[in-house]
């Protein structure tokens, strides 16, 4: 019975029917608006604990880029994947950024992690958006990309220590809609 509930929750949180970056952006903005109380106070009513002065004002969603089978195993196993030496590498790069190509995102993530292979763009073709109740550490290193127009793009990187993934921490998941 609990497995059926997890399957239903995983399906409910899947972003479906979105075919372009603008559609995914609108969907994620709506999800963020619906979840403002969670983003401000965490899934269990606690503040999202990000180890820094502040994350550019308000708390927000953080994204993990992995392939779909890896995310499913993590969700059903209730644990975060190890994709960097510090545990789980997260970023504020939204999965609908219209000026970032899938290959450039893979290149940037591969450069940022010293542990997980992002050589194949399929590794970053799928996203999971999170709001954590536990600690998340902002890294000194940044995700540096080159836009489709040749301009630099910079995003923050975060690490979450290995630990249990609570179902309420996963906000949405689905296919990325980067340029391309």
From Swiss-Prot:
Q: Main role? A: Hydrolyzes cytokinin glucosides thus liberating free cytokinins.
Biological process annotations from GO: carbohydrate metabolic process; cellular response to auxin stimulus; cellular response to cytokinin stimulus; cytokinin biosynthetic process
Catalytic EC class: hydrolase
Q: Which Pfam families match?
A: RolB_RolC
State the UniProt keywords alphabetically.
Cytokinin biosynthesis, Glycosidase, Hydrolase
Tell me, using the record's free text, what induces this protein: Down-regulated by auxin but induced by cytokinin.
Return the EC number. 3.2.1.-
Q: Metal-binding among the record's keywords?
A: no
Question: Matching InterPro entries, A to Z?
Answer: Glyco_hydro_41, Glycosidase
Where expressed (tissue)? Accumulates in young leaves and shoot tips.
Molecular function GO labels: beta-glucosidase activity
Superkingdom of origin organism: Eukaryota
Q: What name is this protein filed under?
A: Cytokinin-beta-glucosidase
Name the gene. Answer: TROLC
Q: Which organism is it from?
A: Nicotiana tabacum
